[in-house]
């Protein structure tokens, strides 16, 4: 959520930035009207409160003099009713303002390039050289099915499209990847491993910005057909990313600045409806309703967040480098960033079968956007004032897409897969999956 004071002091400028950089039309007239109503009701409530307090003091003095106070009591009661009504109206207007604020995207950092979509992202760097094959390249689906490790029909039978069952060496490789990532981040990058719920409530989803704008992208709990109609329905949603529960651990907290940065990592399944992705990546593991991800989250002091973004992105890059997977680093343009981000780097891994780079990690500085929604603050020692923290998150990495990259980049002519060197300790001595 952006700072409401920005709308009060620089409304036209903010509206222009949102239009230019986010293609978002801020309703300036509505914002102005609501702010005028808020001010008027605030003044009215304050005046009524002051007058009521003054009349209440008069009642005490009149009573001490033995005077009839019935008229004064009536006046105070009337003012009390008017004050209550004004407060109700003020709360209503403030709720409308908050709802409006919750639907406004974050303002991009100054260095973020202006652009409409991913075609205008900027390549920052590349690492590694794509392997040259002397045999016909197979995609990960052909490889996985040939090894008996990817069973998409079973996923359809159990649940539906965009689900998969993994078996044998492929399932173990998938597990090895997540363990390797967690070990790297906790042992070398300073993150604390965290286990979190996979179901979260309404407040948690508001805190990180999934609600109210992106409810259709979530899987919500509800009774199945034929279930007892008297069953209690729990108002939960499955997490779309571990960013949601992990970041919300600091919701409504005041952290000691000396304890920052707070660096947390979690391996979880993620659940997404892919509501806007109909017809895209229908083959294979690239776009699933359920996939695993190792997430990195940092909570930092405001002046440290841009430095932290470079560090966090470097941690994601290290995973790819140790796996010897070629990738490129992209700075997202304003039109391709997520709703709550102020600056984002995407890492795109080389997939030989597609002959292109595909996103495998997104690392974002959310600035104080999430912190304001969550009221996550910090305070320096000896300082009475608090300030909002800055939050960052990044994939370190998406496990399923990393599996895709390993299968395709480490394939052999006979359809077997050579296990990357750094994963061998996690594979129980298996060096080739065949």
UniProtKB/Swiss-Prot annotation:
Enzyme Commission number: 6.1.1.11
Subcellular location: Cytoplasm
Keywords for the protein's UniProt record, in alphabetical order: Aminoacyl-tRNA synthetase, ATP-binding, Cytoplasm, Ligase, Nucleotide-binding, Protein biosynthesis
Binding residues for L-serine: 241-243, 295, 395
Keyword hit for Nucleotide-binding: yes
Cellular component terms per the entry's GO annotation: cytoplasm
Listed pathway(s): Aminoacyl-tRNA biosynthesis; selenocysteinyl-tRNA(Sec) biosynthesis; L-seryl-tRNA(Sec) from L-serine and tRNA(Sec): step 1/1
GO molecular function: ATP binding; serine-tRNA ligase activity
Gene Ontology BP terms: selenocysteine biosynthetic process; seryl-tRNA aminoacylation
Family, similarity comment: Belongs to the class-II aminoacyl-tRNA synthetase family. Type-1 seryl-tRNA synthetase subfamily.
HAMAP family xrefs: Ser_tRNA_synth_type1
Subunit structure: Homodimer. The tRNA molecule binds across the dimer.
Domain remark in the UniProt entry: Consists of two distinct domains, a catalytic core and a N-terminal extension that is involved in tRNA binding.
Protein name: Serine--tRNA ligase
Organism: Glaesserella parasuis serovar 5 (strain SH0165)
